[in-house]
């Protein structure tokens, strides 16, 4: 059997920020879902610090040509060299193998980032090779543009994280079931005007819904949800309200007393260029932060409070 064809790609971008500002964005996988558009979620499975190098094992969920894929990768980080190598341990068809490298070079006043990939496809199928080539091209270009934007706008106040929690006197599986079955939210949640839910792969959902905000405006959102029975659901919005550049979230359930503390976590990146047009010429980024915190927090609390009413009707 001949060796499979190995395809290679090289993508570069120059960033107007020092290596010390760029490298941590690539190194910290918890930042990827709200930084890189294709990345839905990353779980850090294992980490080993070994002197000048760190080794990690990750499971990633990401979109490729509009389809959600998941795989396990190993990474070796060498900060002193501005280098991060990666190799998929378990790939998702039609990818048979994939690896690569991030290389960062300090320039006068900035950083050159090089992203290398090498990959093969199942059975050397030419249609599969073309599909993977499109995905690598699209995702690499998008990730480098997002990396540049994130590094050049660091600490500008556009990143916002917050959480709301509600105690529910019900078993965790029942609360999880309420959050998991978003297809029933139209009947259960007054702030949801329309909902469509698909789950072609167990535990990976596509959720589209129209949500009524506190000011009675209606926003259409589309999210990829990754479900971990029976204590966690993570999601990333792929169709966003106009004020947001990114929005990720997590529903978590923590046992307490005879029930659970249900928490809704949000991380958003605001679009400062839209603030004036959407909120008025005198509106500030602080106004936008307050509005987003209030709107998302209100809807999250409504969802959790409705779960509480649904699951413990006698208490209410």
Segment roles from a protein language model:
Residues 1-53, 133, 141-201:
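Hydrophobic ligand-binding cavity/cleft-lining segments
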Residues 2-4, 30-34, 43-94, 183-187, ...:
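Glycine-rich portal/gate segments that line the openings of hydrophobic small-molecule binding cavities
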Residues 4, 56-65, 70-72, 87-141, ...:
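Beta-strand/loop substructures that line and gate deep hydrophobic ligand-binding cavities in soluble
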Residues 12-14, 76, 103, 165-167, ...:
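Generic structural detector for well-ordered beta-strands
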Residues 15, 117-119, 168, 211, ...:
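Hydrophobic beta-strand positions in extracellular immunoglobulin-like domains
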Residues 35, 43-48, 114-116, 126-130, ...:
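Short, tandemly repeated low-complexity microdomains enriched for cysteine and small residues
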Residues 136-144, 148, 296-300, 304:
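N-terminal membrane-insertion helices
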Residues 161-163, 220, 248:
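Transmembrane beta-barrel architecture of outer membranes
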